[in-house]
Design a protein with these regions (language model features):
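Helix-turn-helix
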Residues: 10, 14, 18-60
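Alpha-helix N-cap and coil->helix boundary residues
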Residues: 27-28, 109-113, 159-163, 188
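Amphipathic alpha-helical packing segments from all-alpha helical-bundle domains
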Residues: 105-118, 122-152
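Hydrophobic/aromatic residues within well-ordered alpha-helical segments
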Residues: 50, 57, 61, 65, ...
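Short amphipathic alpha-helical interface segments enriched in basic and hydrophobic/aromatic residues
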Residues: 16, 20, 24, 62, ...
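N-terminal intrinsically disordered/low-complexity leader segments
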Residues: 1-6, 76-77
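Hydrophobic alpha-helical connector segments
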Residues: 56, 69-107, 164-165
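Hydrophobic/aromatic-rich alpha-helical bundle segments in the mid-to-C-terminal region
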Residues: 129-133, 137, 147-198
């Protein structure tokens, strides 16, 4: 990476950190330049304005999400995707969910991007759409697909798959948000999530 490319990435990293704490509107170009250790005028040689920085951050965030999120890559009609889920057990479901949660909470880029989206979703329509897609639409689609798949295989009772998916995944979102606000409660939330998933499989186990 060239020096200019390195500085550009440093600006993006600093912007993500500041935007995730104090929001886009409250962060000035001067603060961004100071965080990187460059002059304000120098920053404009990398980005036209603050909006251009935000646009670049959103694009990078979307690319990382598409690459790493289990929800974005789900294809329940693809045998290659469903192969390792054919004999899904409560233990497997717990590990699947907790693995994704740990990634979301502890990957610095993803964690900061989520907080930035939470702050900015009420001021930026594009961010609101991204927040809805990432935290609701894709999650519900993934778990509805999982439930339908397990019902077809005779592992879960045949009920309303969308409501079953909501019962499974939406409480987990509440605990995930709790961890964002109070990181010290992650162990507590993890225990509750595990109990919740196991109870779901007990309640809906095919008779």
């Amino acid at each position: 990476m060239t020096a200019k490319g390195s500085t550009k990435q440093e600006i993006l990293d600093a912007a993500l950190e500041l935007f995730s704490v104090q929001g886009y509107e409250a962060t000035s170009i001067s603060q961004l330049a100071e965080a990187v250790g460059i002059r304000k005028a120098s920053l404009y040689s990398h980005f036209e304005n603050k909006q251009a920085i935000l646009d670049a951050l959103m694009q990078a965030t979307l690319e990382q999400y598409e690459q790493h999120s289990i929800f974005a890559k789900a294809d329940w009609d693809d045998p290659a995707f469903t192969k390792d889920k054919e004999n899904m057990t409560p233990d497997m479901a717990v590990q699947l969910c907790l693995g994704q949660i740990r990634y979301i909470l502890h990957d610095p880029q993803i964690s900061r991007a989520r907080k930035m989206l939470t702050i900015e979703q009420f001021r930026n329509r594009q961010m609101a759409s991204m927040q809805t897609k990432r935290n609701y639409t894709d999650v519900m689609s993934y778990f509805t697909g999982l439930v339908r798949f397990l019902v077809r295989r005779g592992q879960l009772a045949d009920s309303d798959p969308e409501i079953m998916a909501a019962q499974l995944c939406l409480p987990v979102s509440v605990w995930l948000n709790l961890c964002d606000r109070e990181p010290e409660r992650e162990a507590e939330a993890t225990r509750l999530i595990e109990r919740h998933i196991r109870q779901f499989f007990d309640v809906y186990r095919a008779k």
